[in-house]
């Protein structure tokens, strides 16, 4: 995003494989400063061209002295930019400047008490003792020349170090993790106190810049957008429509695997509310015919993905003069793939590969944003809360929440039970606290008694998790009285259900979805 980089101070984060690397960039953006995550292989020249105010080295699972250790372009240290090494990043800096890194006697994982020994700029106005989050198997045992010890812990004599003359800093713990009680303040001290950044990254500025960028890119040509009703595609559609109006056409495919009222809600919001040109395709019978008798989850995903492509292709071929395809690719998608997205699309991010003869120029206005930023953007654009805060929903829809073969009866059970769950969670005021919640049909039946009669009906599973980004998740502690209301309502209001179970498994070992 070239325009933004020129207008805003930027902090570059180099990725050395930490599970927390995205959190670092997100924390910095929360401060109102733009930040990007880049592979550790980026060159010093490439960084110089971005004109950042500072660099952060992330943590990682490797040992700096081990086979396959990840390194960076040594010329990065010659750029004269402030550098902040976190965990592996500190060890890499130590090795680079002639210090010593060794394996610890035991791996340290969890909370530790940090004692500040030297109040460098990194620890300005922070308490002398604070709880931090450790996750490492190696230690810095010898400081490089010119460095001093900033902080220690019981198991880590050099938990923080600095060479303030060269603006080089390192910590053995993870300030980006919320368990580090003053971690945000420490990162702020680096961003503002050391690098001298100014706030300026916000959604209002983003919208202004992105609207102009879309207009310049598209000109008088036309754009096609696959609208699912999910957060990402909804925000993309509204943003582009705000920029170019009727030059945008959306295709909404109703595959019959949507949640209760979802298809009607999409049309009402976008066709009537935003006055957008939306083509609705009723393809329920087409999808159900293809899924008949299929039980394997991967095969179901493949069939749904492929059929979506064929339906989209059929509709797109009826439209003339479509030059661009709008896609809701997020920054996390680019980071996790490790490569930038190609300029000409042959595969759609959300639905699988489009036919090879369908060539579009790609527009990805969200590809510098994280999910939480997309929600903020959606609110700024005036999209209703029920869409902006909509639960994450998989592309195959309810097709992977019905375990085994999909039938209309099973879909109806999941659709109705899920609607009750959502209604009660919202009533209880828990909808913003729980990251994701839904019902699933595991395909098992059990004996029950209803109205003095024996029943042999389906079991419905409830899944609710708390998470920051979906990479890890914990099962949500929904109050018992709320669970009871949900259970009673589902059993009484949804036909062919006589038992409710609650999934109390975290991710890992389980995934959030059941299929």
Curated annotation (Swiss-Prot):
InterPro entries to which the protein is assigned, alphabetical: Class_I_gatase-like, GATASE, GMP_synth_C, GMP_synth_GATase, GMP_synthase, GMPS_ATP_PPase_dom, NAD/GMP_synthase, Rossmann-like_a/b/a_fold
Domain GMPS ATP-PPase as annotated: residue spans: 201-390
SUPFAM superfamilies xref list: Adenine nucleotide alpha hydrolases-like (SSF52402), Class I glutamine amidotransferase-like (SSF52317), GMP synthetase C-terminal dimerisation domain (SSF54810)
Enzymatic class: ligase
Record's subunit section: Homodimer.
UniProt-listed PANTHER family: GMP SYNTHASE [GLUTAMINE-HYDROLYZING] (PTHR11922:SF2), GMP SYNTHASE-RELATED (PTHR11922)
Protein name: GMP synthase [glutamine-hydrolyzing]
Species annotation: Bacillus cereus (strain ATCC 14579 / DSM 31 / CCUG 7414 / JCM 2152 / NBRC 15305 / NCIMB 9373 / NCTC 2599 / NRRL B-3711)
Gene designation per UniProt: guaA
């Amino acid at each position: 995003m070239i325009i933004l980089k020129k207008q805003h101070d930027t902090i570059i984060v180099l990725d050395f494989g930490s599970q927390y690397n995205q959190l670092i960039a997100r924390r910095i953006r929360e401060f109102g400063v733009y930040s990007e995550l880049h592979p550790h292989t980026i060159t010093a020249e490439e960084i110089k061209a971005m004109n950042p105010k500072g660099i952060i080295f992330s943590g990682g699972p490797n040992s700096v002295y081990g086979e396959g250790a990840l390194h960076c372009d040594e010329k990065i240290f010659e750029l004269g930019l402030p550098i902040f090494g976190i965990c592996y990043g500190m060890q890499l800096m130590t090795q680079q400047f002639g210090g010593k890194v060794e394996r610890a006697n035991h791996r340290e994982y969890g909370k530790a008490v940090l004692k500040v020994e030297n109040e460098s700029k990194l620890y300005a106005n922070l308490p002398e003792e604070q709880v931090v989050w450790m996750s490492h198997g190696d230690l810095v045992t010898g400081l490089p020349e010119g460095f001093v010890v900033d902080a220690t812990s019981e198991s880590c004599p050099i938990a923080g170090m600095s060479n303030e003359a060269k603006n080089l800093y390192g910590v053995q713990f993870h300030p980006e993790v919320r368990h580090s009680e003053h971690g945000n303040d420490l990162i702020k001290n680096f961003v503002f106190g050391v690098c001298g950044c100014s706030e300026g990254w916000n959604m209002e500025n983003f919208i202004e810049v992105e609207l102009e960028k879309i207009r310049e890119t598209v000109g008088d040509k036309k754009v096609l957008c696959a609208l699912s009703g999910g957060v990402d595609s909804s925000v993309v559609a509204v943003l582009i429509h705000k920029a170019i109006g009727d030059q945008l056409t959306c295709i909404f495919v109703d595959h019959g695997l949507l949640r209760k009222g979802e298809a009607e809600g999409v049309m009402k919001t976008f066709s009537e509310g935003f006055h957008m040109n939306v083509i609705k395709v009723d393809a329920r019978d087409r999808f159900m015919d293809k899924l008949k008798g299929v039980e394997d989850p991967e095969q179901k995903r493949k069939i749904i993905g492929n059929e979506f492509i064929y339906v989209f292709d059929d509709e797109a071929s009826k439209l003339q003069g479509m030059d661009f395809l709008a896609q809701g690719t997020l920054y996390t998608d680019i980071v996790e793939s490790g490569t930038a997205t190609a300029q000409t699309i042959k595969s759609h991010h959300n639905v699988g590969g489009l036919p090879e003869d369908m060539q579009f120029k790609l527009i990805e206005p969200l590809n510098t944003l994280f999910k939480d930023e997309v929600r903020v953007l959606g609110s700024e654009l005036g999209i209703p809360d029920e869409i902006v805060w909509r639960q994450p929903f998989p592309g195959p829809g309810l097709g992977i929440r019905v375990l085994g073969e999909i039938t209309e009866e099973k879909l109806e059970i999941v659709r109705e039970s899920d609607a009750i769950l959502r209604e009660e969670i919202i009533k209880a005021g828990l909808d913003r606290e729980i990251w994701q919640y839904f019902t699933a049909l595991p395909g098992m039946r059990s004996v029950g008694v209803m109205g003095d009669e024996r029943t042999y009906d389906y079991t419905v599973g409830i899944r609710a998790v708390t998470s920051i980004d979906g990479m890890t998740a914990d099962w949500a502690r929904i109050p018992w009285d709320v669970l009871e209301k949900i259970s009673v309502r589902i059993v009484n209001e949804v036909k062919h259900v006589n038992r409710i179970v609650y999934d109390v498994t975290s991710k890992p070992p389980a995934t959030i979805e059941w299929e």
